[in-house]
């Protein structure tokens, strides 16, 4: 789920962004992450008008355990998604797709927070594994 292309999937083969990040690290190339909230799938609510039965809606439903982890931590799912992405070794920065000040504040809080520890990242991975 965390690596889902959602509705942007156009190739028959499944993307493997983690392999790309690892390859970039091996060659000392920084990575600019995109889609940290997976087109809204890793947020509190899908706010797209055409979300019903979309790839994003399917991913949103599969991300319920992710939202529970965020709630346990006392932060929004969007903040956790951004913290997760920024905590990935090799990811240097993120492209933000914010629509309002609240979303921007979540991103700034994620950037100011310490990296997530590996055990929490593994727990998140296990909770939303394909």
Please describe what each predicted stretch is.
Residues 1-129:
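Beta/alpha (TIM)-barrel catalytic core signal, keyed to glycine-rich beta->alpha loops juxtaposed to Asp/Glu
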